[in-house]
Swiss-Prot record:
Protein's name in the database: Transcription factor LBX1
Native source organism of the sequence: Xenopus laevis
Region (Disordered) residue spans: 1-36, 211-267
Stored Gene3D superfamilies: Homeodomain-like (1.10.10.60)
GO CC terms of this entry: nucleus; transcription regulator complex
Residues spanning the membrane: none
Acidic residues bias locations: 255-267
Expressed in which tissues: Expressed in all myoblasts that will populate body wall muscles as well as in a group of cells the migrate into the head.
């Protein structure tokens, strides 16, 4: 029992000492202001947060205007609660942070779009490579080889390129183009044969007669072009130096007499 009484007396003495120490403290200068500066009201009353009251308050007022009014609370009290809410300050800070990120992302996206559009407008067209100008000797040798060999082996390709002073790519390209040209020519010939088969016999005869007339006309034109050349050579034939002048004069007189005789006979 004595130990319990001693413990009670020691606890009461400690409480009395604490009370005496609190009584000795000076009273606060402003009793209305709370002692802790970390209360919600102190945070909301800071000047940095007051600036956001207008934006956040208007946003809350607009959102609250869509909702039905709560029962038992007037409009002024609801507006004050929305302005002094700690969620408003948190929302404002978050909106500022995300707003900066959104602006940077949008600017980057706009810059990319502008660069892509600008690049698409000014992308130069790919210039086609200039075609290789082969010499007559090179074309002759290539055509001669193409007559009996349409496809070249690597060894043959190297041999032709070295022989004609060309590159392997040029030889390959020439043979590819030549095979394509041969294929087109064969297709055109097949189309011509099929079209002639579909034609009537009378149309075929008409085509043949037209071709024969064209050939005969060309032959006549050639003969006419040759005849004046022969007349010019006969008229301008040089006289032999061995022929005397008297013989020439006599021949002229005989020709004149013959012409006169021919005229008389004609009459």
């Amino acid at each position: 029992m004595t130990s319990k009484d001693e413990a009670k007396s020691s606890a009461s003495s400690v409480e009395e000492r604490r009370r005496n120490a609190l009584d000795l403290l000076p009273p606060p200068a402003n009793s209305n202001k709370p002692l802790t500066p970390f209360s919600i009201e102190d945070i909301l009353n800071k000047p940095s947060v007051r600036r956001s009251y207008t934006i956040c308050g208007t946003a809350h007022l607009l959102s609250s205007a869509d909702k039905p009014p709560a029962a038992g609370l007037p409009l002024s009290s609801r507006a004050l609660l929305s302005q002094t809410s700690p969620l408003c300050a948190l929302e404002e800070l978050a909106s500022k942070t995300f707003k900066g990120l959104e602006v940077s992302v949008l600017q980057a996206a706009e810059g990319r779009d502008g660069m892509t559009i600008f690049g698409q407008r000014q992308t130069p067209k790919k210039r086609r490579k200039s075609r290789t100008a082969f010499t007559n000797h090179q074309i002759y040798e290539l055509e001669k080889r193409f007559l009996y060999q349409k496809y070249l082996s690597p060894a043959d390709r190297d041999q032709i390129a070295q022989q004609l002073g060309l590159t392997n790519a040029q030889v390959i390209t020439w043979f590819q183009n030549r095979r394509a040209k041969l294929k087109r020519d064969l297709e055109e010939m097949k189309a011509d044969v099929e079209s002639t088969k579909k034609m009537s016999p009378s149309a075929v005869e008409a085509v043949l007669t037209i071709s024969e007339l064209e050939e005969s006309g060309s032959e006549r034109g050639n003969s006419r072009s040759r005849s004046p050349q022969l007349g010019l050579t006969s008229n301008h034939m040089p006289l032999s130096p061995s022929x005397p002048l008297t013989d020439q004069h006599a021949s002229k007189e005989c020709s004149e007499d013959e012409e006169d005789v021919e005229i008389d006979v004609d009459d």
